[in-house]
Amino acid sequence: MMRFVYRVQNLLAERGEVLNDLQRGSGVNRTTLYRGPQRKQTIAATAYYLGISAEDLVAGTDVEEVWNRDTSEY
């Protein structure tokens, strides 16, 4: 699970504009993502919102590959 959490944190850091959009639109903030008591759940929910599956994160699949997939695969 920790690998999953760190992978999501790294992906969010790479996509700072996505994090900013989430902060404005859904009340997710940096404290919740990185230090909050439900950090893992919030990060998992954020990854799901971004269209990144747990399998892709754990496997280390390139995020651009995930986002460029045909939506019919999901």
Task: Mark where each language-model region is.
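Short, charged recognition helix plus adjacent turn
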Residues: 10, 48, 56-74
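Helix-turn-helix DNA-binding elements, focusing on the entry/boundary residues of the two helices
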Residues: 19, 40-43
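Recognition helix of helix-turn-helix/homeodomain-like DNA-binding domains
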Residues: 27-41
